[in-house]
Regions:
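Fungal secretory targeting signals
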Residues: 1-20
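Multi-pass alpha-helical transmembrane bundles in non-GPCR membrane proteins
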Residues: 19-344
Length: 344
């Protein structure tokens, strides 16, 4: 989901995360931190934090950074000066300890979209369908990713950042994993199911290609996480490019799947010719179009409106309905009559 950004946007985002912090490098901010620390965080003058701040892991030093950031930002806005970023992020009003409340809310909206999608897959795809288990597992990776996204936007800490990034990478890689299985027909065919009208035959075990693809994806993910974990400093550029390559490959495959019948690349169902193109196939192309359009929001990076809504939070808002569109497509594809003719 986070990997559908164009090259330029992704690199800019990575660079911004690491270096775009003119606000926290300013002498004014540094002096404010010293004054605040002496006045509120010293042993003699320690100020107790509110319960929401303590529950979300804020320290006195963190609270000083927030207070100084907001004070300087308020003054800059009043004087008509530009708004600066601090530690690679725009200044947001916090709410109950949440650093980016809009992104938290929209992450939870995406979580809800995956809950709805999971319920739809379980309810409308027959249990014996060879792709059902893959879609269910992908839904769970999505649920996991959006929970950690909400946690990360609540408190931007090293551990929450890594859990967010690693969970997102797992979701994107698993999406590519099941896409290859679906489009290249690597799924195992059960002996008996409600999708086939053929005489029961011995079950087809998992193919060597399927096993090799599964092992490759596992190795790629483990290597990815290990590399980022063992480095002395998190490699933001590599992380974003990794997700981008996986995400764009996923999108490209489904875009090829959605091509007109006259130029079809994939045989969408093994029992049908390449020219067989049900109407719902167009939804895959619409999905790619919408994800690209949603990602374009990141091109218009701007200081948060009212210090609440920024381009990144709007991107999260846009991805929730896109997820619902995708689940609808997966179910329609799984319920096509051509699956009844699949044989081991």
């Amino acid at each position: 989901m986070r990997a559908h950004l164009p090259w330029a946007v992704l690199i800019a985002a990575a660079v911004g995360t690491v270096w775009a912090s003119s606000g926290d490098r300013s002498p004014e901010f540094e002096n404010c931190l010293k004054r605040c620390g002496n006045a509120r965080c010293s042993t003699a003058h320690h100020v107790s934090l509110s319960i929401p701040l303590r529950l979300t892991g804020w320290t006195c030093e963190d609270d000083c950074k927030y207070s100084c950031m907001q004070d300087i930002t308020s003054r800059n806005i009043k004087l008509g000066d530009r708004v600066h970023q601090y530690y690679g992020k725009w200044p947001f009003w916090r709410l109950l300890g949440m650093q980016e409340p809009a992104s938290v809310a929209f992450s939870l909206l995406n979580f809800w979209a995956h809950v709805r999608g999971l319920a739809k897959v379980r309810r409308e795809i027959p249990d014996a369908h060879p792709m059902k288990r893959y879609y269910i597992l992908w839904a769970f990776t999505g649920l996991n990713a959006w929970i950690w996204s909400a946690v990360f936007h609540t408190r931007d800490l090293s551990i929450t950042e890594r859990l967010d990034y690693f969970s997102a990478a797992l979701t994107i890689l698993y999406a590519l994993y099941y896409t290859v299985i679906r489009l290249f027909h690597l799924y195992p065919i059960p002996q008996r199911n409600r999708l086939t009208l053929a005489t029961p035959e011995p079950p087809l075990g998992t193919s060597v290609t399927h096993k090799a693809w599964s092992l490759l994806c596992i190795l790629v993910y483990v290597t990815h996480v290990s590399y980022l974990t063992l480095l002395p400093r998190f490699d933001y550029v590599y992380n974003i490019v990794f997700n981008m390559v996986i995400g764009l490959t996923h999108n490209a495959l489904w875009l090829l799947y959605s091509l007109p019948a006259s130029i079809s690349v994939f045989r969408r169902f093994p029992s049908r010719p390449k020219s067989y193109r049900p109407a719902f196939v167009t939804s895959a192309g619409i999905f790619v179009l919408f994800t690209t359009a949603a990602s374009a929001l990141e091109l218009f990076d701007f200081p948060p409106i009212l210090r609440v809504i920024d381009a990144h939070s709007l991107w999260h808002l846009a991805t929730a309905p896109i997820a619902l569109i995708w689940y609808n497509f997966l179910v329609e594809d799984a319920r096509d009559e051509s699956w009844r003719e699949v044989r081991a």
